[in-house]
C-alpha cells in the first residue's frame, strides 16, 4: 500500500507545504536553516519551530496524558493533525516523544513517503558533545515492511527565539519555469 501511495505522489501538486501545512514532524525537523527552540515546563515539552510558525506542546507522562487533539498549532491557532498527537517521557537523559493519530500525509515530501492514522512515530532526542541528536523512527505495518529511521543533528546558536516565518501559499511555478528553460522551451 505504501509503495502505491508513493508512486501516485506528485510533488508539484501534492506537497502540503504549498498551502502552509506541515506534512509531518519529520518534514519540519528536516527543513534547513530554520530555528527550533525547545523548552521544558513542569508538565510539558514545548517546541517552537520557525518553519510555518509552529508551536508544539507535548505533555510529559505516559500515553494517558496524550490528547486526542493534535499537539501542534501555528501562531494563528490552526491545529495540524499531520503532526499527530504526542506525549513525552525520559529514559535516562534521552527525551522520547511518541506521536500517534496522524492525518494521512507524507513523512518526506520530496519522495512521497506516506504516513497514515496507523503510523506511530518515536523521536529520541539526546545531547551529545554539545549537539542535539534526534533519531526519528516511523512504524506502520500498513505502509512499511520495516520501520523508517531518520536521523538529524543540530548545533546550538546564540539566538534565544525563533523568527516569525509568516507563510503564504506558494506554488512550484519557479521550478516549472526552471525546468522549461533547461529543456530549451
List the model feature ranges, each with a label:
Residues 1-185:
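PEST-like low-complexity, intrinsically disordered acidic/proline/serine-rich tracts
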Amino acid at each position: 500500500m505504501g509503495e502505491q501511495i508513493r508512486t501516485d505522489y506528485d510533488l508539484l501538486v501534492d506537497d502540503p507545504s504549498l498551502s502552509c501545512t506541515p506534512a509531518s514532524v519529520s518534514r519540519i525537523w528536516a527543513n534547513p536553516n530554520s530555528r527550533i527552540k525547545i523548552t521544558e515546563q513542569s508538565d510539558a515539552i514545548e517546541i517552537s519551530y520557525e518553519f510555518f510558525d509552529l508551536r508544539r506542546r507535548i505533555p510529559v507522562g505516559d500515553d494517558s496524558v496524550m490528547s486526542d487533539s493534535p499537539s501542534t498549532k501555528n501562531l494563528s491557532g490552526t491545529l495540524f493533525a499531520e503532526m499527530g498527537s504526542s506525549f513525552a517521557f525520559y529514559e535516562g537523559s534521552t527525551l522520547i516523544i511518541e506521536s500517534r493519530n496522524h492525518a494521512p500525509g507524507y513523512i518526506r515530501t520530496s519522495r512521497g513517503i506516506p504516513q497514515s492514522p496507523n503510523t506511530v512515530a518515536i523521536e529520541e532526542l539526546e545531547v551529545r558533545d554539545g549537539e542535539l541528536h534526534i533519531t526519528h523512527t516511523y512504524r506502520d505495518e500498513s505502509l512499511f515492511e520495516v520501520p523508517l529511521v531518520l536521523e538529524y543533528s543540530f548545533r546550538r546558536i546564540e539566538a534565544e527565539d525563533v523568527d516569525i516565518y509568516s507563510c503564504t501559499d506558494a506554488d512550484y511555478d519557479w521550478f516549472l519555469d526552471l525546468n522549461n528553460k533547461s529543456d530549451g522551451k
